[in-house]
Amino acid sequence: MYLEKNIHVMDSFEFEYGRVLENVEVEYRVFGTPKYDEDGFLTNAVLFFSTFNGIYSFLRESHKYIMSHGNFTDEFYFIVISPLGTPGSCSPSSTGLNYEFPRYTYADGINFIKQFLVEKFKIRKILGLVGEGIGGYIVLSWACEFPDEMEFIFIVNSAAKVSGYRFIISKVLELIMDSTEDYYTDGYSISKTKNMIAVNALLFAHSSSKKIFNNLNNDEITAIFEDFNDECIFSDIYDFKFRNECSMEYDVVDKLGNIKAKSLFVGTNDNYFNFELDMLPFKELVPNSIVIKQEDTKENYYFEEKDYAPVGKDVIAFLEQFKK
């Protein structure tokens, strides 16, 4: 489903440490049916935050099944926002600041979105937050710090902190980007492009089920890798580096008990996020939460729509209770 891109320009935005940028752009898309209370406030806003471009996305692949069987476009008003630091919205590449862009945190990212919502939409309370992968970091940070601001959260393939093997991956990504010879020069360069290809290759290695990769021959893996690299070839080194630095500081484990929203967590293949290590602990750490798994029974790289039926039914049942 193609969604028309919209741009809202905020007069200014102040980062936590005090730096202010002016004429700050926010890229967003909307779909669904808005509903309002008697005072004109939007009551059914559901915000969505995606994972890395190019890697396997449960929500992208299961979207057709969930939407066609749940009729949510008539009940929810979805707002898909490009967060702070990502191209389209205010980011190192889109502002032209590149390596001089302000260093930001997830607290900055939440303040960025909240300011946008105040300026663009009339909302007292968000109905729900949906996040996948690193998009889940935003949702969990928000639900921990401002637990009264949403009714539900829905998280797919994410984690409560960047640590262990995932921190090692982030450090390797940092080393690759720091080795760029002309990092502190503006414009295109071969070294920047080569290093981003290396970054994408590392992400690819951790983006899907090891079981599935072991059942593919090298030609099939090469074809999948080329598709992945085509999607990521225009990734900007500055956007990625600042986002990577932000993610390495992410840790909300000790705050998960603050969450008041009804919560659904879905884990899928053993990829960048591990179900047992990353997703299952939410069952004990987050009050009033449900944790389910999309079982990896496939021998092929791609799932078909019917493969999402078991988990899709649980997702639909969870979301049904929030229809206004």
Please tell me what each predicted stretch does:
Residues 1-47:
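Catalytic-loop region of hydrolases
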Residues 29-94:
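N-terminal cap/lid subdomain of alpha/beta-hydrolase-fold enzymes
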Residues 174-261, 273:
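Alpha/beta-hydrolase
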Residues 265-271:
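Conserved strand-to-loop "acid loop" that flanks and positions the catalytic carboxylate
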Residues 126-164:
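Conserved hydrolase catalytic core segment
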Residues 107-128:
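Conserved acidic catalytic loop of the alpha/beta-hydrolase fold
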Residues 288-324:
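Catalytic active-site module of serine/aspartate enzymes centered on a nucleophile-bearing elbow/loop
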Residues 272-278:
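Conserved alpha/beta-hydrolase "acid-adjacent" motif
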